[in-house]
Amino acid sequence: MASKTKTSLSETTTTTTPTGKSSPATPRIAKRTVNKSETSNNNSPSTTTPHSRLSLDRSSPNSKSSVERRSPKLPTPPEKSQARVAAVKGTESPQTTTRLSQIKEDLKKANERISSLEKDKAKALDELKQAKKEAEQVTLKLDDALKAQKHVEENSEIEKFQAVEAGIEAVQNNEEELKKELETVKNQHASDSAALVAVRQELEKINEELAAAFDAKSKALSQAEDASKTAEIHAEKVDILSSELTRLKALLDSTREKTAISDNEMVAKLEDEIVVLKRDLESARGFEAEVKEKEMIVEKLNVDLEAAKMAESNAHSLSNEWQSKAKELEEQLEEANKLERSASVSLESVMKQLEGSNDKLHDTETEITDLKERIVTLETTVAKQKEDLEVSEQRLGSVEEEVSKNEKEVEKLKSELETVKEEKNRALKKEQDATSRVQRLSEEKSKLLSDLESSKEEEEKSKKAMESLASALHEVSSEGRELKEKLLSQGDHEYETQIDDLKLVIKATNEKYENMLDEARHEIDVLVSAVEQTKKHFESSKKDWEMKEANLVNYVKKMEEDVASMGKEMNRLDNLLKRTEEEADAAWKKEAQTKDSLKEVEEEIVYLQETLGEAKAESMKLKENLLDKETEFQNVIHENEDLKAKEDVSLKKIEELSKLLEEAILAKKQPEEENGELSESEKDYDLLPKVVEFSSENGHRSVEEKSAKVETLDHEPPQEQISNGNSNGNGMEEKEVNGKPEVETEKKEKKDESQDDDKDDSVEVIFKMWESCQIEKKEAFPDKKSELESQEEEEDSSKIDESDKTSTENIDETGNALTAEDQLTMEKKIKKKKTLLGKVGNLLKKKAPVNQK
């Protein structure tokens, strides 16, 4: 037993060294601090992402509940914890400590990995947010670019409309010029008709003059019959005729000048008409060039339509690809859901295994690592799905760009259709104008034909007049011949001279009239050629107008067909746009569904991480509970062993005390008056208060010195404390400790004092000893062993009472010879010694476990 106490004391001394003063209470505190640090590490990334905040908010009540669950274990006294830790340290193997340290390091590493994964996840989420912001900025830029393109296209369309309007205005101006030229031609025709009327009037005047000349000639013939009588009258008539001839010459000259001027005017007008017709030909050629340009535009539109068809087919192929990719994403999501379900099932199984048995901790750790790997794979799949989503968003952006391009092309086609419709309306207006012009020209043609017929009639009339003039000349010549014959018959030479003069005059007049007729014929030929040229020009212009009308009709028909085809293509493009919009909406919906599913996957991942954290926390709790139970079990075993040792020691001490009491009783039977010396037992009991006084004097020292002093006392056997020879040994130990011969002086003083004083001093010393023991007990153990000590004190007191009863019975048997006073004094002494022995036994019992510790 002494060896056991020595080993326990050596263990306590090693644990109470300066380096390990606080070591007994450290293991459980360290575990709690580790758990707190782990919770703090788990909570630390909560400031990074909203998902981790959710996880923190979910895990915080669990952590609080875990702290609340652990809190009832805290009121355990530090004395018991120190004892348990000392016992555990005495029994624990280094393998368990290394295993615990490895487990802690693994847990720290796992927490660090989880925190790093959460940080990476937060970074990935931030990058996704940044990518979304950049995508929004790009969409805004694209919108701005599209707006700018729309503005440019609107400006270009406005410029095109302005150019078309300018061309239309130029055409209208040309038409107005043509109208003006037609009006000038009409005016020229009117002037020509007026000139013809004037010529007719002049011819009528000439005819009248010729009729007057015929009358004069008849008068001259009548007068020539009586030539002899009226020669003078004939001479006057000749003068009159000569004057008339001069007047006729003047009239002919004026008519010639007028006809030359009118001919020059007609030539100038015809040249102007030729220039106008050339301009019309140039405008017609320009119109043909415009028609060719429009045909090129129509061809370009057909090419654009083919490109739109190709884009439509590409859009269909892209939509099919997106549908296939969406199906693949749905399959991947289903696989992810299956993996999550399997992960939840595995987590439930892990929880059941953790709740069921503590032996399967290693299996649960391996499953946790598998779950981490699955989480990593899930995160990689989520990252891949996010990349696929980004690619899909990019492709959707490209599809939207193509759709916007198609919309722009459709708008362009609509604008071109509107322009074509406007041109069609204008062409219809031009056709109406052309028809009206044709009608007007036909009316003018009919007028010109009527004028030509009238001019022909006038020519015939002029021919008839010329014939009448020729007949008149023949008549005049016949009359001259008759007059000549008469004159010859009469034989008057004067008349012959007159007749010669008349012949000359007649020849001159004939020549003049012939010249006038030639000129009139030439003028008539010129007018006929001009009329024929005007007819030819009118017919050619009519043919040109008919050709233009036919071309316009054909062009209008073509334009109507093109408009119809363009309308059909526009309807088809509208349907395609609607389909593409529907497909885009479906793609957006699918993308939103995939995003929602991804969010659900992320939430489930967060929930899995939370469940992993909870599982880890529960596993830590279970490990702590196991360690606590093991320590409690070991402490209970050590307490049982200590109690057994204490029982053995107490039994031995009780036996020793009973022997001491018997010896004391036997010694008291001897006469107390011999030499006034104290008994051996009283001397031994006097030594104990001195030791207690020494410990009380040095109570300000550390606990280590007290424990060392108690060791020196407890290592001695109880028989040495009682015997006289050993009392000297105790005195030697006290001398070695204090370096002074206090015991010998105290013995001498005690021999001089009386027994009552010794008893009072012993009572005071026992009281001090009791107080010092109470102080040591408070320093060593706070409050928890009071019940055990009270039970032990009651047992010791009961045993002491039994021993006292036996001793009193022995005294009653042997001490009948004593007086009553002696009996009273003996009873008082026995009671005092009883109390002293009980208190000393309690002190020794209380100090024994301290020394063992």
From Swiss-Prot:
Transit pept. (range): 1-84
The protein's name in its UniProt record: WEB family protein At5g16730, chloroplastic
Compartment(s) of residence: Plastid, Chloroplast
Protein family: Belongs to the WEB family.
Compositionally biased spans, kind Basic and acidic residues: 402-465, 698-718, 732-753, 778-788, 797-807
One Pfam short name: WEMBL
Modified residues (Phosphoserine): S790
Coiled coil: 94-670
Entry keyword set: Chloroplast, Coiled coil, Phosphoprotein, Plastid, Transit peptide
Main location class: plastid
Biased composition (Polar residues): 92-101
Comp. bias regions, Low complexity: 1-27, 36-49
Region span, Disordered: 1-106, 386-465, 666-765, 778-820
Matches recorded under InterPro entries: Web
Keyword Nucleus: no
Compositionally biased tracts (Acidic residues): 754-763
GO cellular component: chloroplast; microtubule associated complex; plastid
